[in-house]
């Protein structure tokens, strides 16, 4: 089964509630930031990070009055894996699939569950739109492996299932061991 942990659809009930109710638990399931403003008072993204699709990694939501992170498409808002309640929900969903008899997962975009917690602009060169293609801001970060090991312990331990992670974002061969080492790896 293709398991997508990085994002939901912008039509998912969680995101719809998150947009409409900033005080809801669902709002904290996503990565929201206040805008910066230009001289004319127009909202600007909170960082200069580019998405994998070369536009901003942020989309402004008029209803919420904030930017949400989306490293792929504005139709795919990123989940906030720093939120322990979100992690518990995603782990429960994964367990449910296993309980229904699924014998494995291809984990889509798994390298991107953690973000640079400082949310500072990248210092890499920027493109004509002022955006930096700096995957180090949201790929293969140390917290990712904490999240995945937690999932391994709470969901996968004791189960006979196959997991294959789609890993990108400039993962090195050494980093591959963080994912796949039999004793200490995340899968």
What are these regions (language model features)?
Residues 104-106, 160-164, 187:
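Structural preference for beta-strand elements that scaffold enzyme active sites
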Residues 167-187:
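Noncatalytic carbohydrate-binding groove/subsite architecture in carbohydrate-active enzymes
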Residues 1-95, 99, 111-171:
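Acidic/aromatic-lined carbohydrate-recognition and catalytic surfaces
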């Amino acid at each position: 089964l293709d398991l997508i942990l990085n994002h939901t659809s912008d039509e998912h009930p969680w995101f719809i509630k998150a947009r409409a109710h900033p005080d809801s638990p669902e709002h904290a399931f996503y990565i929201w930031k206040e805008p910066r403003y230009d001289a004319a008072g127009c909202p600007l993204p909170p960082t200069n990070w580019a998405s994998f699709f070369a536009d901003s990694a942020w989309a402004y939501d008029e209803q919420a009055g904030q930017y949400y992170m989306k490293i792929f498409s504005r139709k795919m808002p990123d989940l906030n894996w720093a939120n322990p309640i979100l992690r518990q929900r995603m782990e429960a969903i994964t367990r449910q699939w296993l309980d229904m008899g699924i014998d494995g997962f291809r984990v889509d975009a798994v390298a991107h569950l953690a973000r640079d917690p400082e949310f500072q602009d990248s210092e890499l060169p920027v493109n004509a739109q002022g955006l930096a293609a700096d995957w180090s801001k949201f790929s293969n970060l140390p917290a990712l492996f904490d999240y995945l090991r937690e999932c391994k312990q709470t969901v996968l331990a004791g189960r006979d299932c196959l997991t294959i992670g789609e890993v990108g974002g400039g993962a090195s061969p050494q980093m591959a061991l963080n994912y796949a080492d039999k004793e200490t790896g995340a899968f």
